[in-house]
């Protein structure tokens, strides 16, 4: 096992740092074939079947071509749970877990203020469903609805909800179009929309550029807040009194995003930093 690990690690070092290459090689053997780090360090002898050899060779070719390990394995970890992923969805990032934590805190505050209230939460642009599923599992009494424009993404999200036992309602919806929803029908809207300007693409890692869905990543250079304005407008029309809109953002546009929320009629816009000190989230509330 140690020789397989070493060979893969050495090949991956052409694309990644030594630490990243080691982590990916460990992940492939552990999550793909059930070979633990202990087995690797002990150089435990295990014969791969013909099928396992074929799968391993295919995985190695995909990894060496720069495909993210999460797509190669078909899964990624988020908030302590394993989610299925494919090139139809973004790979969940640890920073987004902080948005989920904030949403849970706000939802619990809304529930405490009105214990009889049946909370309705929307995850706009759900992708893999990691936000919606995590919220439903943390807030089992809430109704959670997840939107996405991509049917491929919705299929992955539905699979994750079913696997993890989260009763989430999924809808194919373009958040840029008029929402056509009743006033005061949603208590909390959470979103991690596309926010990377096309001009930033040249600074991004090539495995992200080549493999993750561009429609879920990028916005035009001349209109970086297009999704945030749509979210703010829709939220102002549909949030209940004291309901909230919470979003992940491009750290270059924190104050502009907060201003867009206020201009749409929301109040008390707040910028929150992530664990690395970057402006990562903006939230605002509906008026009384």
Task: Write out the residue ranges for each language-model feature.
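N-terminal auxiliary segments of SAM/dcSAM-dependent transferases
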Residues: 1-76
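Alpha-helical elements of Rossmann-like donor-binding domains used by nucleotide-donor carbohydrate transfer enzymes
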Residues: 7, 27, 55-58, 98, ...
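Helix-turn-helix-type domain boundary/helix-start signal
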Residues: 14, 46, 89-90, 247
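Short helix-terminating capping/connector loops at secondary-structure junctions
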Residues: 18-21, 112-118, 241
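SAM-dependent Rossmann-like transferase core, predominantly class I methyltransferases
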Residues: 44, 57-140, 144-156, 172, ...
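An acidic site on a long C-lobe helix of protein kinase domains
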Residues: 52, 92-95, 227
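S-adenosylmethionine
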Residues: 138-143, 147-288
